[in-house]
Amino acid sequence: MLELKEITKTFHPGTVNARRALDRLSLTLEEGEFVTVIGGNGAGKSTLLNAVAGAFPIDGGQILLDGQDVTHMPEHRRAAFLGRVFQDPMMGTAPTMQIDENLALAARRGRRRGLKWGVTRAEREEYRALLAGLGLGLEDRMSAKVGLLSGGQRQALTLLMATVRRPKLLLLDEHTAALDPKTAGKVLELSQQIARRDGLTTLMITHNMKDAIACGSRLIMMDGGRIVLDLAGEEKRRLTVADLLERFSAVSGREEAEDKLLLS
């Protein structure tokens, strides 16, 4: 479904600040897989998602989605079949627009728009049902401005907007990191629920080892722009945080991981 073939990316090449963020990285995701990605700061996790999303050109390698070569496809064109949720709840929504208007924008992404714009009654009923599934009461507040929502409500709405058109690939970039633990748990639960319901192929970055182990069907660990661990099936189900820390130390050559990586 998603295939990355030896992709590389170096920032500030030819300078003293040159840094290789992706080092001939190869990865294949099957349709419907939910893969969690962990690693220390600078491991290349966000660079990986940005490369897939087309946020910048890669230096080498190939990116295939559903067999189509999208390596040189610009970001705005990839947005038609990718969904993405960022760490900052303020990103991904229009704060001065209503909840239903935000959903309408997301639903029409990639489509040709005419001079007439508005939310139809049928669309409002569709959005009401989708919002009710979040369990946050937003279906009764569809005329509210998004800027008035809490961080958790806004992130849940962003998740819904990213998946309303059932994208080929869902990218979750530490999307619960800025939320309090209770709200983060709720958004994470919703993420898994929506991915399972719609059979979405999902790539989720997290610094929380417990979440990385508990979520999805596969776990990969990055270090130095490479994938150093790739676990699935029974091997992943048997994992503990202690096991993961031991494996991280073994493959990275460090005594212990960064504090942020150990959050659990």
Feature map (PLM): residue ranges:
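A short, flexible loop at the N-terminus of ABC-type nucleotide-binding domains that lies
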Residues: M1, T10-R24, P74
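ABC ATPase C-loop
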Residues: A162-T163
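The feature captures the beta-strand-to-loop junction immediately N-terminal to the Walker
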Residues: I38-G40
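Helix-to-loop junction immediately C-terminal to a conserved catalytic motif
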Residues: A53
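Conserved beta-strand-loop-alpha-helix hinge in the C-terminal portion
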Residues: R226-S252
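H-loop/switch region of ABC-family ATPase nucleotide-binding domains
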Residues: T206-H207
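ABC ATPase NBD coupling module
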Residues: T15-V16, P57, D69-G83, M91, ...
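Conserved ABC transporter NBD signature motif
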Residues: G61-Q68, L229-L231
